[in-house]
Regions:
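Short, hydrophobic secondary-structure boundary micro-motifs
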Residues: 21, 98-102, 147-148
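Residues that recognize and position ribonucleotide moieties
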Residues: 4, 11, 32, 59, ...
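Unchanged
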Residues: 39-62, 72-127
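Residue-level recognition of beta-strand microenvironments
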Residues: 66-69
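Conserved N-terminal beta-strand and adjoining loop/helix that marks the start
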Residues: 1-18, 64, 85-89
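Nudix hydrolase/Nudix homology domain
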Residues: 27, 105-156
């Protein structure tokens, strides 16, 4: 069975460190991931970006740009998730951060907080496929535009 999942994510890099969240549920549990997530009904891409980024990091986005789209296939034991990811570079004010809520309006927050992680320390052992795709992009890998298939994905 293949499940399509579309998510919108914010990328913030400062001093070669990536603003990450740590997932507490789902296929990327206990891995570093990008802040972001799924659209709500009638929500535009940038509205989702702003809402999800604030919910998961506490930071408000001052500006965004460089929209791009990638995809990966994550094969778990009984299903395959086709994860379509929309990336935006974001600018935030580090001086203003709201408290991150455990419980959101209609769901639980699936993030255990934020972490600034050196890009060189992010790899397949500790990161989601989204971060791995971002690293591929940042290294100017020409294959970044092609799909990646993760067979027998391990949930930590």
């Amino acid at each position: 069975m293949i499940i399509n999942h579309i998510g919108i994510y914010g990328i913030c890099i400062r001093d070669n460190k990536l603003l990450c969240i740590k997932k507490v549920r789902g296929p990327y549990k206990n891995r570093f991931d990008l802040p972001g997530g799924s659209q709500k009904e009638n929500e535009g891409l940038t509205e989702t970006l702003v809402r999800e980024f604030q919910e998961e990091t506490g930071y408000h986005i001052n500006g965004y740009g460089s929209c791009r789209v990638y995809d990966v296939f994550v094969e778990e034991s009984n299903r395959t998730v086709h994860h379509i990811m929309v990336f935006y570079d974001v600018d935030i004010n580090l001086e203003q951060q709201d408290v991150i809520s455990e419980k959101l309006e209609d769901e639980l927050n699936d993030s255990s907080g934020i972490y600034w992680i050196d890009l060189e320390k992010l790899d397949i052992k500790n990161s989601s496929p989204l971060i791995l795709k971002l690293k591929q992009e940042l290294s100017n890998d020409k294959g970044a535009l092609e799909k990646v298939v993760y067979k027998n994905w391990t949930i930590l």
